[in-house]
Amino acid sequence: MAMYDDEFDTKASDLTFSPWVEVENWKDVTTRLRAIKFALQADRDKIPGVLSDLKTNCPYSAFKRFPDKSLYSVLSKEAVIAVAQIQSASGFKRRADEKNAVSGLVSVTPTQISQSASSSAATPVGLATVKPPRESDSAFQEDTFSYAKFDDASTAFHKALAYLEGLSLRPTYRRKFEKDMNVKWGGSGSAPSGAPAGGSSGSAPPTSGSSGSGAAPTPPPNP
């Protein structure tokens, strides 16, 4: 099985636990976040779906070669925190939105009033008087607190997004990654230790006419 060599067990192995992003995927997600109108609940509801499209898995392992023809970058701890802040801010909902009513006001359904009664100065039966909320009302205080939270959530969202958009990624690709990490990809193709380079064992056979002993040949006897 093909795999990286022993040098992988140092720095390259440690980085497999870090979040990685593919550069084009990163640009797409941040562009879509920039189009979000945070003041609109419908747009805030889109944020979790946008963030779910951000892929942060490590693109390589000891048995999986770094991708070719793609640029990847490691995300810093600060970038991960900024993404988490955007996710958290997206969960904000105004209390008035949750109640589907304006805090402190009474929903009124007036009864049918005859044309003659409408000219009377008295308050018609069935028509409730709408009073503005008082500062001492608990509902008013809840709504004030809710809007303060909205300001905090909006600020957190825009600051985190500005940080991510200004982030200087350090993209890398296969050749650069393997050079920087000093790793090589392949199987165990090297010859065993002690084996000759030519792949043969023993000494070379003697040439023709040679005894192989290194001594001069014995002359023929005299007749």
Swiss-Prot record:
UniProt biased composition (Low complexity): 202-216
Location in or out of the cell: Virion
One Pfam family hit: TMV_coat
An annotated GO cellular component: viral capsid
Keyword Lipid biosynthesis: no
Gene3D superfamilies, A to Z: Tobacco mosaic virus-like, coat protein
Keyword Heme: no
Protein name: Coat protein
